[in-house]
Amino acid sequence: GPKTKAACKMACKLATCGKKPGGWKCKLCELGCDAV
């Protein structure tokens, strides 16, 4: 659900997106969240 997706994106932000916002790992992580 939306809550899971939001939590997933928050985890992405903590893991990679916060350090490298445009990085491929960040994009891959968020794409994975959208697939959930």
Curated annotation (Swiss-Prot):
It comes from the Eukaryota. Keywords: Amidation, Antimicrobial, Disulfide bond, Oxidation, Secreted. It is found in: Secreted. Displays cytotoxic effects on human melanoma cancer cell line A2058 (IC(50)=1.4 uM) and the human fibroblast cell line MRC-5 (IC(50)=4.8 uM). Has antimicrobial activity against Gram-positive bacteria (C.glutamicum ATCC 13032 (MIC=0.4 uM), B.subtilis ATCC 23857 (MIC=0.4 uM) and S.aureus ATCC 9144 (MIC=6.3 uM)) and Gram-negative bacteria (E.coli ATCC 25922 (MIC=0.8 uM) and P.aeruginosa ATCC 27853 (MIC=1.6 uM)). Disulfide bonds join 8-33, 12-29, 17-26. GO terms for biological process: cytolysis in another organism; defense response to Gram-negative bacterium; defense response to Gram-positive bacterium. Transmembrane segments: none annotated. GO terms for cellular component: extracellular region. This is Turgencin-A. The modification Valine amide is found at residue 36. Its main location: secreted. It comes from Synoicum turgens. The modification Methionine sulfoxide is found at residue 10.
